[in-house]
Design a protein with these regions (language model features):
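Long, well-ordered alpha-helical segments
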Residues: 99-104, 132-134
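Non-catalytic DNA-recognition/assembly elements of restriction-modification systems
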Residues: 1-36, 124-137
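A short beta-sheet element
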Residues: 34-36, 44-101, 110-113, 117-122
């Protein structure tokens, strides 16, 4: 099966992430995402798109039951503990998410107490290169 690098098939929007300490968050309606999902709700948003968030640090790396990637849609805020991926044309957002949810990160993450998937390593992760029709079924 032909494979493709994440950096080839996704826009990596990590530079747009902004962490907000709990004491500085203004309560609101927009989800505030971290490595493992919604952490809070805040008054503003920095993204408004169909995206996949992939844990950077503190993720469920190695788990067979808890995913390391999840799909978000619409207005939200993402902190610096999740990589932000926007699929390029020809890559379905659900297929991207499914391909990454339980990705084998053995040998890809580092850190003794808090494992981290660096952006450099994440960019080289491979997913199947399927036609859009095959991604949908």
């Amino acid at each position: 099966m032909e494979m493709m690098l994440l950096e080839e098939c996704c826009e990596i929007l990590d530079s747009m992430r902004i962490p907000i300490t709990a004491s500085n968050r203004k309560e609101g309606i927009y989800p505030y995402y971290g490595a493992n999902g919604i952490q809070d709700h805040v008054a503003d948003y920095i993204f408004d798109d169909e995206l996949v968030l992939l844990a950077e640090d503190g993720g469920n790396f190695g788990s067979k039951t808890r995913p390391i990637a999840y799909r978000v849609s619409g207005k939200c805020w993402v902190n610096n503990h999740a990589h932000v991926l926007k699929p390029k044309e020809g890559l379905n957002v659900d297929f991207l998410c499914y391909s990454l949810m339980f990705y084998n990160t053995e040998g890809l993450v580092n850190g003794a107490t808090r494992q981290k998937l660096t952006q450099t390593t994440m960019r080289k992760m491979l997913i199947p290169n399927l036609s859009i029709e095959n991604q949908l079924y």
